[in-house]
Amino acid sequence: MTLALLGAGAIGLAVGVPWGATLIGRDRVLTPIAAGGLRLTDARTDRTFGPDAIRTAGPEALASADLIAVATKSTALPSVIQTITAHARPHTPILSLLNGLSPVRDLAAALPNPILRGMIPFNAVWHGPAHLHLSSTGSVAVEDHEATATLPQVERRADMEALQHGKLLLNLINPINALSGLFLHAMLSDGSWRRLYAATLTEALQVYDMAGLAFTKAGPIPPRL
C-alpha cells in the first residue's frame, strides 16, 4: 500500500515516519529531516529513523497514493481540499487525523473520496530541528476499514465517532490550562482550577445527553467520574 501524508509538521512526522508514509509538507521542516533523519522520543522510548527511512514529495504524490492521511491544522482545510481535488484520485480514501468533529464533515461535503476518522492521543514538541518528543504514549486510533488494515502501530476501531466525542471532552482542559497560565500538573493541584474544569465537563456532558451524542473515554479516566 502506498500511503501519502499531507501536512508533515510535528504531528504529521510523528505519525507518518513510523508508518513509512510519503511526506508532503513545508521544505523548511522536511529538508533537515530528509538530510539527517528523525529522532522520536517519549517517556519510554527513543527511536531514530535514518534518512533512508524518510520519503518526501510534492502534492503530485497524491495521485499514486492508496491512502491519504491529513495531519494539517484545521484552519488549512480549505487548502487541503483544493490540493486533494487537484491531485488525488476521487476514490482514494482520506484519513483525517485532525482534531475536532467538523473536519470529517467538511471533507465529506467537499470531496467524493471516502473519508475515514482518526485520532491522535498525544502531542509532539520540537526539541531540535530533527528531534520530536511526544507528550504521552498511546496508539493512534483509526477507523476500521480495508484501507487502514496494514497501518502499523494503530488501534482499529468501529466506534471512531464516539471516540472523537470523548476526545473533545478531554480537550476541554486545554483552554482552562491556557487561562490558568500554569503547567498542567500545577493547575490540577489547585482545587479552584479543578472545580472549573469539572463544571465545564459537567456542562459538556449535559449538552451531549440532550443531543443524544454517544461518547467513549479517550483517556484513562471516564469523563463522568
Report residues per predicted region:
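Small-residue-rich helix-loop
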Residues: W193-L225
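Active-site-adjacent beta-strand anchor residues
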Residues: L5, L23-I24, V70-A71, S96-L97, ...
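Rossmann-like NAD(P)(H) cofactor-binding subdomain of soluble oxidoreductases
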Residues: R47-H133
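Rossmann-fold dinucleotide-binding core
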Residues: N99-L182
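Active-site lid/adjacent beta-loop-alpha segment flanking the redox-cofactor pocket in flavoenzymes
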Residues: G181-L196
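Short active-site oxyanion
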Residues: M1, W19-A21, A65-I68, P90-I94, ...
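Generic structural signal for well-ordered, non-membrane alpha-helical segments
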Residues: G12, E146-A147, H165, W193-L201
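NAD(P)+-binding Rossmann beta1-loop-alpha1 motif at the extreme N-terminus of oxidoreductases
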Residues: M1-D46
